[in-house]
UniProtKB/Swiss-Prot annotation:
Record-listed E.C. numbers: 3.6.1.23
Record field: catalytic activity: dUTP + H2O = dUMP + diphosphate + H(+)
Keywords linked to the UniProt accession: Hydrolase, Magnesium, Metal-binding, Nucleotide metabolism
UniProt function note: This enzyme is involved in nucleotide metabolism: it produces dUMP, the immediate precursor of thymidine nucleotides and it decreases the intracellular concentration of dUTP so that uracil cannot be incorporated into DNA.
Lineage: Bacteria, Pseudomonadati, Pseudomonadota, Betaproteobacteria, Nitrosomonadales
Pathway recorded for this protein: Pyrimidine metabolism; dUMP biosynthesis; dUMP from dCTP (dUTP route): step 2/2
GO MF annotation, one: dUTP diphosphatase activity
Keyword Metal-binding: yes
Gene3D superfamilies per the UniProt record, alphabetical: 2.70.40.10
Keyword Transmembrane helix in record: no
Disulfide bridge partners, by residue number: none
Cofactor requirement: Mg(2+)
Protein name, as recorded: Deoxyuridine 5'-triphosphate nucleotidohydrolase
Length: 150
């Protein structure tokens, strides 16, 4: 299944490096740091990084998620400051990435470095039906480890 999304390039350097899927099975498109200069993220610091692009999904049955890149988080402690970025279908502004250095060492971020990934997901909007009680289930109200570890 394929979806066509309107993309506005805000940084001319991206014209030759648009996000693309690395493999046929890839779910995420890499987003790049469209900064003018190298930036240093000190331990514990969070900064907003422009991606140089805007998208408009237009269809309320879709949303985009900005997620961390696994290598940056595991090897360098660079994750998203908001953990997940949710891009609503009607948002048209530049995609920004909140980068947080949860590591113990400073991290050097170079211009056009891949910093996060964008995943397009289907969305179902819910209507609420108010009830006095739920039909009983096997789990009931058990949570937070109630099903065990093994």
């Amino acid at each position: 299944m394929s979806l066509t999304i309107d993309v506005k390039i805000l940084d001319n350097r991206l014209h030759h490096m648009l996000p693309s899927y690395a493999t046929p099975g890839s779910a995420g498109l890499d987003l790049r740091a469209c900064t003018e200069h190298t930036q240093t993220l000190a331990p514990g610091e969070t900064i907003m990084i422009p991606t140089g692009m805007a998208i408009h999904l237009a269809d309320p049955h879709y949303a985009a998620l900005i997620l961390p890149r696994s290598g940056l988080g595991h090897k360098h402690g660079i994750v998203l400051g908001n953990l997940v970025g949710l891009i609503d279908s009607d948002y048209q502004g530049q995609l920004l990435v909140s980068c947080w250095n949860r590591g113990k060492e400073s991290f050097i971020l170079n211009p056009l470095e891949r910093i996060a990934q964008l995943v397009i997901v289907p969305v179902m909007q819910a209507n609420f039906n108010i009830v006095d009680d739920f039909q009983a289930s096997e789990r009931g109200t058990g949570g937070f480890g109630s099903t065990g570890r093994q």
